[in-house]
Structures are given as structure tokens and as C-alpha cells.
Amino acid sequence: MHVTSREAVEPFTTKDGSTIRELHHTGSQSLAEATLEPGQATERHYHRRSEEIYVVLEGKGTLEIDGEIREVEPWDAALIPPGSWHQIRAAVPLRFLCCCAPAYSHEDTLFE
């Protein structure tokens, strides 16, 4: 059994300023917690192979997927298909889970 405590994972800051804690990473999937400060947004990007799910835990913001924009709040879950441009922006402090299958990789991620 492999159980990871959030507190045991060292957070890192991405180039767009979001804070990430990668909780699990196998070849077939990955799970990370991401946080954004009010007004902050992830860089608009897509994944060539990975399908991604965002689950909002705390806060509110807007999620854009392929030009469609929607407000998100706690326990909203969004499916982001491979090849879909996406970006999330925090209206207030925002904390969400990111699940990728196959697992997240920098090589699979393309930015504008």
C-alpha cells in the first residue's frame, strides 16, 4: 500500500506562479494539488496525450477549455480531454486537484 501525506510532500512553484504538490506519480496516472492566489492563473496549455481532471477543493475561479469559460467552485469536477487548450484563474485563493492519465510530463505539455 502506498499512502502519501500532503504534509510530507515538498511544494514547488511553477513558472506561472502556481504552487504544486505532487501526491502520486506512476506511469499510468498522476495526482497533484495546485494552489493559486487571487487574480493568478495557470499558463494556457494543452497535453498531447494526457487526459486531465480538475476537482476544485476550495475557492472560486474561472476555467477555460478550448475557448469555453465557466465559473468553478468547490466540488466542481472538470474533464479536460487531450489536445484541449485550458487555463484556470483564481477569483479568491483557489485549491484544486489535478489528475492526469497517463501521468503528467513536461514533454507532453505545450504552452502558447
Question: What is the role of each PLM region?
Answer:
Residues 49-51, 56-61:
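Glycine- and acidic-residue-biased ligand/ion/polar-headgroup-sensing regions
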Residues 68-82:
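Short acidic-glycine-tyrosine-enriched beta hairpin
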Residues 57-58, 73-74, 92:
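A cytosolic small-molecule/anion-sensing beta-strand core signal
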Residues 32-47:
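Conserved short histidine dyad/triad with adjacent acidic residue
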Residues 41-43, 78, 82-87:
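Histidine-centered metal-chelating micro-motifs
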Residues 82-106:
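Ligand-binding loop in jelly-roll beta-barrel domains
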Residues 1-30, 109-112:
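A short, N-terminal "cap"/entry segment at the start of jelly-roll beta-barrel domains
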